[in-house]
From Swiss-Prot:
Effect in UniProt of substituting N155D: Decreases glycosylation levels. Decreases thiamine pyrophosphate uptake
GO cellular component terms listed in the entry, alphabetical order: apical plasma membrane; extracellular exosome; plasma membrane
Residues with attached carbohydrate: N69, N155, N197, N298, N393, N405, N416
Membrane side Extracellular: residue ranges: 56-229, 274-309, 380-455, 523-560, 619-638
The name this protein goes by in its record: Choline transporter-like protein 4
A GO term, aspect molecular function: thiamine pyrophosphate transmembrane transporter activity
PANTHER family in the record: CHOLINE TRANSPORTER-LIKE (SLC FAMILY 44), CHOLINE TRANSPORTER-LIKE PROTEIN 4
Classification lineage: Eukaryota, Metazoa, Chordata, Craniata, Vertebrata
Catalytic activity: choline(out) + n H(+)(in) = choline(in) + n H(+)(out); thiamine diphosphate(out) = thiamine diphosphate(in)
Reported function: Choline transporter that plays a role in the choline-acetylcholine system and is required to the efferent innervation of hair cells in the olivocochlear bundle for the maintenance of physiological function of outer hair cells and the protection of hair cells from acoustic injury. Also described as a thiamine pyrophosphate transporter in colon, may mediate the absorption of microbiota-generated thiamine pyrophosphate and contribute to host thiamine (vitamin B1) homeostasis.
Membrane topology: Multi-pass membrane protein
Site, as annotated: Breakpoint for translocation with NEU1: T308
Post-translational modification: N-glycosylated; N-glycosylation of Asn-69, Asn-155 and Asn-393 is required for a proper thiamine pyrophosphate uptake.
Outcome of substituting N69D: Decreases glycosylation levels. Decreases thiamine pyrophosphate uptake
Amino acid sequence: MGGKQRDEDDEAYGKPVKYDPSFRGPIKNRSCTDVICCVLFLLFILGYIVVGIVAWLYGDPRQVLYPRNSTGAYCGMGENKDKPYLLYFNIFSCILSSNIISVAENGLQCPTPQVCVSSCPEDPWTVGKNEFSQTVGEVFYTKNRNFCLPGVPWNMTVITSLQQELCPSFLLPSAPALGRCFPWTNVTPPALPGITNDTTIQQGISGLIDSLNARDISVKIFEDFAQSWYWILVALGVALVLSLLFILLLRLVAGPLVLVLILGVLGVLAYGIYYCWEEYRVLRDKGASISQLGFTTNLSAYQSVQETWLAALIVLAVLEAILLLMLIFLRQRIRIAIALLKEASKAVGQMMSTMFYPLVTFVLLLICIAYWAMTALYLATSGQPQYVLWASNISSPGCEKVPINTSCNPTAHLVNSSCPGLMCVFQGYSSKGLIQRSVFNLQIYGVLGLFWTLNWVLALGQCVLAGAFASFYWAFHKPQDIPTFPLISAFIRTLRYHTGSLAFGALILTLVQIARVILEYIDHKLRGVQNPVARCIMCCFKCCLWCLEKFIKFLNRNAYIMIAIYGKNFCVSAKNAFMLLMRNIVRVVVLDKVTDLLLFFGKLLVVGGVGVLSFFFFSGRIPGLGKDFKSPHLNYYWLPIMTSILGAYVIASGFFSVFGMCVDTLFLCFLEDLERNNGSLDRPYYMSKSLLKILGKKNEAPPDNKKRKK
């Protein structure tokens, strides 16, 4: 009865793969797949390139990278090449009117003249009454105070220049931050109109001190990297060696290591059960019950009631029981999983070039991200600059008839205007053109292009690695039958025939990810809503989309393996992979969990080892090191430690992603091998002898005078 039921289940998920005498691993004679999707993808990329060209033609990222003076000219460029900093004549008017940081980021809307300077003022200075009658040249130019607006004549009196706001009336010790001169908080400002006390000024400047501190911190961080970059590279090299050794040694220690890890998980769960029981017993004796607490939104309060620890105890006990039952009844499948891990280690050892393919993926991902970032930046800064007339005090005599806020030419000479302080200032960028009106849509196009290209690059890496590892499994005589350049052959084959299939799978995943991003945006906007029903619905939607994304990633991964082997289109490959996995669902679950546990331990070993070594080295806690190996003196010794840990995690993830792809590929090949062959002379198994031994199978030995042909 059990065999009949199993046959019916197999029929529900398709028929087993039939024997094909012509099959010798990844098919070489194949044709292009999903051509329509390939054409759409190439057209989309062409449009993406056009968007980038348009953004480059119309965009001007200098407004983000460089500050502008009152006339809209860039500091540090062109005629102001030797004047990289921006000085505000009266920065307190900025502080009193708005947030200076937002003013600096959103344009020159600060109500005070601004001028490009070669260096920020270092000493405090205020115009004295006895200097009002002197000329600008005597007070400013000859005393190296080159802070007036361009074009102010030498013979103009100081009082006139101050009335027209052509020169500053005071200077404060300042330091550059964000390309602008900001004063320190401990300076004493002069008496200014509209400011009644120093507290207002101090409160305003305190908003700037974070930027200045950030500048100091950034300088120290740069110094630390300059001092420790060599040792960070050494730490990353150690991470690379550890990752490689861990994978290569799995063929020797996979079995004992998996057993130790499983026993370790059992031990952790057992300790958790013991701890929960002790907490439950103490609270039970105290009589602390949830009925006394009632309902509360303070989750930490539930730690003080016995029901919480009882529920945790039950959950951990159930998990412990499930794991024990799996260890008892699924030990055969665990042995198969261990054997596949050993086989994957051998495959990686035979094709060491696969371990460095993540570098190719990383470079391609970096190109995609950099292209999107530059395109988005240029699009955001597209538009023609707009200039308007502006005066600090429009009620001054002579300003009544001046058309304030009307368009003007910044090159016009306004010094002799009857309105004091009248200037043609930069207002912003025009949004009237076709490109400017379409910026939002083009940005959406760019985001879609970012997700699609990133997913396509990841799909390319998975399919290429699958093709290389499949050629290893289906080589009957190893290593003689393995192709000479399996990775390069798989790369060329994938690009030539299956660009469309990869684009199809990447597009499906992209649409789900875009939906998740939109949902996260809606959730962020509705975060203030207190309706519990709405929050619950939103949480359910987010959970469903997260599960859908995980499932599609899993399905795509196995579909790419089938594409690499058989050269079918995406839908057929996804269907065949899904049916094959469902016919062996228990083996799939066991292998997946064993592999996840092993790779998690591997990452923990590599990252933890590099982290511990980095900590003891950079903190100077390793005695006896020679002069050449002495740790550098750092401002923040944790900075290279965290950098080393992050780099080690990235390296370990790259290496173990290759190993994980190898395991998945060999597993699908193993399942097909079981269905396709029977061990006879005509249909021998391709799996290793250890797998044959675990399964209780063997290949029929050929006669002495014959050699098996494959």
